[in-house]
Amino acid sequence: MPEVRSTCPYCGVGCGVIIEARGGEIVGVRGDPQHPANRGLLCTKGSTLHLTARPLVAQQVRALAPELRTARGARRQPIDWDTALDHVAERIATCVQKHGPDAIGLYVSGQLLTEDYYVFNKLAKGLLGTNNIDTNSRLCMSSAATAYKQTLGADIVPTCYEDIDCADLFFFAGSNAAYAHPVLFRRVEEARRRNPAAKTIVVDPRRTDTVSGADLHLQIVPGTDVALFHGLLHLLLWEGWVDRRFIEAHTEGFAELKALVREFTPALVTQLCGIRTEDLVLAAQWWGQARAVLSLYCQGLNQSASGTAKNAALINLHLATVQIGRPGAGPFSLTGQPNAMGGREVGAMANLLSAHRDLANAEHRAEVARLWGVERVPEAPGKTAVEMFEAARRGEIKILWIACTNPAQSMPNQRLVREALAAAELVIVQDAYRTTATAALADVLLPAASWGEKDGTVSNSERRISRVRRAMAPPGQAREDWRIVVDIARRLQRRLRPGRPSLFPYASAEDIWLEHRDTTRGRDLDITGLSWEMLERDGPQQWPFPDGASSGRSRPFEDHVFATVSGKARFAAVPYRPPAEPIDARFPLRLATGRLRDQWHGGSRTGTLGRLFGHAPEPCIELHPAELARRQLRPGDLVHVTSRRGSLVLPAAASDAVRMGEAFIAMHWGAEFVAGCGDERPTFGVNALTIDALDPDSRQPELKHAAVRVQKAELPWRYVVFGQVPASRQLELQLALRAHFGAFGYACCVPFGHDDARAGLVFRGAAATPVQVCVLQAIEQVFGLEDAAALDDARRGLRSRLRAEGGHVVAIALAGPVEALAAEVWLRELLGRPLPLPAHRLLRPGAQPPAPTVPPGRIVCNCFDVAEAEIRRVLATANGNALAHLQAELKCGTNCGACLPELRRMLPA
C-alpha cells in the first residue's frame, strides 16, 4: 500500500505521520517513528485523522465548489473558478481604487502552510499596499512572541524537545499539556519515569489532567501569574539562588526588576494568588536548587490583557537563575497551532514583515521592498485581529478575506464579530469546510484543500521545519490555498500594476519556499543552508540553519549572546495588573475557557467523528459542587450564563477541578453545536461571553477571564431525540438540525458512537413552553420517526416516539417536563439492540428498564472505546498492579496514552 510521510494538522507539537493511501483515498494513518517530534506516537485526534478524510465525510462537510451570493440573505450558488476569481479580484481592485488599500482586511490562520502564509502576506503588503493582514495566531501566540522579543531580543524559542529528556524540574504554567499537547506530555511522563527524582510544578487555576501527576499544584486565582512569578523571584533573591555573575555579564535591567519584586513578599503574593505560603516557598526552593528547569507554558499565560507581562515575568526567572541556553533548561512556549510559528517566520501579521523583520523599522521595510521588487512597503501599522473586526463594524474595512479560520466561533465578543461581518460589503471565506459558522456568513466561498491534499512546510514549537505532503487529490474543485491566492493576485496585478513584472511567478510550493528562504539570509531564523531536497531526503530540520551549517541549532543562546543590540538579555520590570474585567456583585464568577482532550478548535474536523465526543459528550459549564449547592442547582440543571457581552444557556456540571467562585466552559462549543435564544436573542456559543480586551503590547485578547453570572434557566419543557443514522448522511443531517436551534431557549446537537456504518446523533432542546409541533415533526423526520410508534398525552404535554428496524431500536424521541425524560438514560442503552418489549410499554410514563442496567458513563479510552463503568468493573477485581491489570484486560491506555492521567486517578488508593 502506498505510504506518504507528512505532518499532523492539529497542535504545535508537529507530529510526523505516515499516511496510507489506496485508490486515491486515505485509508490509514500512524505515527512516524523517524520524526523527532513524536517518535511514532500520536494522540486520539492524530490517530483518527484518516477517518476525517473519508469520502463520506468530505461529501457532507467539505466546500466542493466556489459559491457566490449576489445579495445578503440570498442563498449562495455554485459558480466556476474563473468566475469566482474574477469576481473577487474585481471587487478588491475596485475597493482599493475607491477607498484605498486599508479598506481591505485579510484574516488568515496558523493552520495554513508556510507557503500559503507567504503569498497572502506578499499580496497584502506588497501588491495591495496594506498591512491589514493578521492571523488567528494573534489569539494564541502573540504574547509569547512579544515577550521573547522584549527579553531575548527576537521571537526565538530557546529550547527544544530534547530538553524534556534532560530537565529535573518541569514548570507548567497556563498549560494543560495532557489535553493540548498530549504527545509532548507523554514525553514528559516518560522522562519522569526514567528520572524519578525529577519534579513537576503546575500553575493553573483548575485541577487538570496535567495537575494529576504533579508534585506541586499552585492553584492560583485566575490572572495572578505575574504576582506569582515576581513572588518566586523575590524568594530566589532572598535565598541567594540567583547567579549574579551571569546577571552582570549577560543581562541588563536587573536593578529595576529587583526594586519592583522587593514589594512582592510571600504575604502579599499568597494573598493575591490564593495559595499557601509553604507552597510558594517550596516552589522557589525547587526552582532555586534544580539543575535544569524547563518551563512549559501556553494559552493560560498568553490569552490575557497582561499576556506579555506574564510571559516576560516567567522568562525573568530563567534569566536570574541561568536556566537558559543549556540542556534541560529554558522558557518553552508551546505553540497552539501546527504552523503559528511559520506565520511569524514569514511576517504574516499586522506588525511584522518577512523573516522576523519589524514593520516599524524603516530599514526592514526597505529590505523587504527590495526583496519583493516593489516600490515600498506601507508604514502605517495594520489592524490586528480584534481591531480588524472593529474597523469592519465601523465601516472602515469594506472587504474581509478570511482563510482557514472560523472567527464566528473563535473570536471573543461574538456580537462584535457578527456585526462586523454584517457591516462588511463583501465577506470572502476561503476554507476547506462549508459547515463552519463563518462559512455560513460568507458572500463568496472558495473551496480549499486540506490535510492530506496539500504540499508544503510547517514549523513546530521547537523551530523544526517539516514537510507536509499530498496523499490524495482534493475533493470536488477544492484547490491549494497558495494557488487560490496566486490566481487572485495575478488578476489584481493587471488592475493595480499593469505592465510590470509579476510578483507571483510561482508554479509550485517549492518555488514559494525558496523565495521565503532567501528572505531569511542574515536573520535570526536564517535557513539559507537548507534546501527543499534536504527536507525531502533528510527529514525535518531546525532553524537557524544558515548557509554553510551542517545542521540546525537545537538551543539558541548557548553562548549567552542574545539577539539584542547589546547582546545582553533584558529583564522586564513588568507591573502586576489584575484581569481586565473584575468580578462584582452583578457578575460574581470568573469564567475561563479551555480545551477538551479529544476536540480541537471549533471542531470543523474533529467534530465530524462521533467517537471524539465520547469523553465529553455535550456542552456544559463546570462549577464547584459547593457553588451549585449555594445556588440551589443540581448537576444537569440548565442555567443562563451571562456576561456583559452576551448570554448562553448550558447544563451545569459539578466539578471539583474548579474552585468556588470560578467556572469553566470548553472553548470548542460554538454555535455549530450549541445555541438557542435563552434571553430572547440568538446566542453564538461560548465566545458570546468572552471579552475583547487586548494586551497593550501583543494585542492579544483576554480569552481566559470573563466576569459572568449564573442563574437557573426557567425552561421546564424538554425535548431529546437520539438515534442511529447512516454515516453517509450523519453530518448532513446534523447541519439540517442546526437550522432548528432558534426555536428553543436551549438547543444542542452532537454526533456520537464508534460505528462506521450507523452513526449516532442526539438533538436536545429546552423551552419555556412546548415548541410548535411542526418543528418537532421536522426534527423527528431527520431520524425517520414520522411513522414510528407514538405515545402522546397532550394534557400532560408528553410526546414519545420509538422507531425499530429489523426488530432493533434505531431512534427515540421524548418530550415533556423534565421528569418525563428520566427514561433517557436507559433508553439510550437500547439503541442498536433488539427491541425487548413492545414500543408502547417502553414509552409509557413511569416505564422501567426491562432489565437492570448500569450506565456506561463517559468514554475514557477513545482508542478502544472503553467507558467508565467497564473500567470500574475491572478495577473491582484487580489485584496487584491495577493499571497493568486494566491494560491487559481492556487495552485502555496502551495506544496513544491520552487517557493515562484519568486512568491513574481512577485506581484504588
Kindly give the residue locations of the regions a language model identified.
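Immediate flanking context of iron-sulfur cluster ligation sites
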Residues: 1-6, 24-41, 847-858, 876-895
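N-terminal leader/propeptide and maturation segments of large enzyme subunits in energy/redox metabolism
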Residues: 71-77, 239-277, 354-355, 359-366, ...
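N-terminal export/assembly segments and adjacent metallocofactor-ligating motifs
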Residues: 1-239, 249, 257, 268, ...
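Extended redox/cofactor-interaction regions of prokaryotic respiratory oxidoreductases
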Residues: 118-189, 196-201, 226-230, 318-441, ...
